[in-house]
Amino acid sequence: MILISHRGNIDGPNTDKENKPSYISNAIERGYNCEVDFWYVNDKFILGHDKPQYEIPFEFITTYYNKLWIHCKNYDALTKLIEIDRGGVYFNYFWHDSDDVALTSKGNMWANPGCYIPNSIAVLPELKNDKLTDRLGVCSDYIINYE
């Protein structure tokens, strides 16, 4: 099962550190994949949940490309990644609004809380006590609990 840290969180939410590059790096160095909230604004790559917060060099994404699940937070972020990596050859990215499930550029199903689909990524299953049977992976603020 793929274990994905939600915004860098490992043992619970930490809104002061979520999406901070050093926090993301720490989760990856501990062996987890990581979901990040990604913006593209004024030709800059930026991480942040509700708003762009942490500008990052493109090399941050290329360094961790095989461990990142990139949640595009604005249309420009999505179109920039499509331009750079059409078809998700390198990067695993997706966009959604209020959908139950999103399809990533690598063909993975990103299933939001309460949506059970076999072979999908269960996102924050602790919120709805979601079943993990037959899942490809889990994305959680408490990812350490799924080891």
Region spans (language model):
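Phosphate-group recognition and catalysis centered on beta-loop-alpha active-site segments
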Residues: 1-147
